[in-house]
From Swiss-Prot:
Signal peptide: none
Quaternary structure and interacting proteins, as annotated: The system is composed of three essential subunits: KdpA, KdpB and KdpC.
Gene name in the database record: kdpA
UniProt keywords, alphabetically: Cell membrane, Ion transport, Membrane, Potassium, Potassium transport, Transmembrane, Transmembrane helix, Transport
Species of origin: Bacillus thuringiensis (strain Al Hakam)
Superkingdom of the source species: Bacteria
One GO MF term: P-type potassium transmembrane transporter activity
Protein name from the UniProt record: Potassium-transporting ATPase potassium-binding subunit
Amino acid sequence: MIWVAVVITMLLFILVAKPTGIYLEKAFQGSKKLDKVFGPFEKLIFKITGVKEYNQTWKQYALSLVLLNGFMIVVVYFIFRLQGVLPLNPAHIEGMEPTLAFNTAISFMADTNLQHYSGENGLSYLSQLIGITFLMFAAPATTLALVMAFIRGLAGKELGNFFIDFTRALTRVFLPIAFMAALVFVALGVPQTLDGAVTAQTIDGAKQSILRGPVASFVAIKELGNNGGGFFGANSTHPFENPGQMSNILQMMLMMLLPTALPFTYGRMVGNKKQGRILFVSLFMVFLLGFITITTSELNGNPALNAMGIERVQGSTEGKEVRFGTVFSSLYATVTTAAETGAVNTMHDTLTPIGGLVPLVNMMLNTVYGGVGAGFVNIIMYAIIAVFISGLMVGRTPEFLGKKIEGKEMKLIAVTILFHPLLILGFSALALSTSLGTDAISHSGFHGLTQVVYEYTSSAANNGSGFEGLGDNTPFWNITTGLVMFLGRYFSLITMLAVAASLKEKTVVPETVGTFRTDNGLFGGIFIGTIVIVGALTFFPMLVLGPIAEFLTLK
């Protein structure tokens, strides 16, 4: 029965992807029906904020994005610092420590949601609503806006205006879908209130304080926007965030909704629907391989415990919620790291070595399917690399969407693809070389190395999940992961927008018999091979020293 439920969940991922992709294309390309519904409200926003409707250059677009995001980071930072004297604080929570506020503000603006605090006792309701939830809408809207400009550039069109795209992302995508999802979560038992904690009497007569809050609205955008931060410290393992299997499946659907839709949006916007389908199918195969690997490992249990003859019918149950079970916990772990969300319904630090390797590889690749917008930019980056390598092998100038891929584009892509592993491995080396970093490690040996690398991989990939055995709420970890999140977020977005702007200016080369097609199975295979060779092998030495070595020692 459990496998039937898994297959149905997978089919739901597939069935909603194309319709959502079509809707996104219409939402950003000026559908008359949608303009009638949302247009008046959007024009009012533009009038109040003074936004002028004109096409921006890639530099203007990128600058607008960075300045708006930077302003939001500063505002939310001060909300966190001053929450102790601000209203909507029934628990009388004090202001955040400076480095923790720095880390948290960047974390949520970068769509990472790395949390070095526990939500129920670290933030007031005002901070949760105006700080956290606000950024949970703004962060994915930023990258969804950028990916639309990116695709327009690839299609040879004007990039558009960041402020207009940003507003449309909020009004036409995130607000309506999150509102409907929140209502469903309330129906499934997720609380939604501004009242303080409830005092309950336990069976043995003791009193217990049960915390609650505006959880349903929080969870809806947390999953839809690939944010992942928890209202409670336990995240989606907490019964108030994720009461049962129905809410669990809905959360996974929301996480996958936009990342899986973007290949179809791309195909329609560039006039090559088959290429969009090939990208979707290729990535789904990689996703499926990851799910099979982690599930097999978790169901086989811990080798050390198996050797002792301990029952393992349910597999490795350490760190897992009984109401979800091993299989759906494995699926959730695959989804949350493939879609770069970071929400967890099981503790990743307790996964088996090979089970923990899958989420780690998903984040290192940062492209299966990746988070809202940012992940798709990485997908196209790998697609261009695949075309470039194929062109070199046959001695032909590579072309992508009829545009020649030349030195300028490849230099930008080369810098972008190198920057991700440099952030992860460089900061991991720094943490391991000083007691400021190593003092936070709770496990010695191979698992301790994985804890450190996982933290920086999660930060660089804007995922936010963690091996929570790491004691990371220290100035060193707050500052270094904050820097990694900021650089990992904005560097690749800006460089790839420059690539799209460069391709926009090029004339389309007529297709000939010798043109390498990017809308067939051959390209799909080369695309997957490129992801594995260029992406996975970059981190292979670290994976050998971490989860693979741990697995071999347990064996």
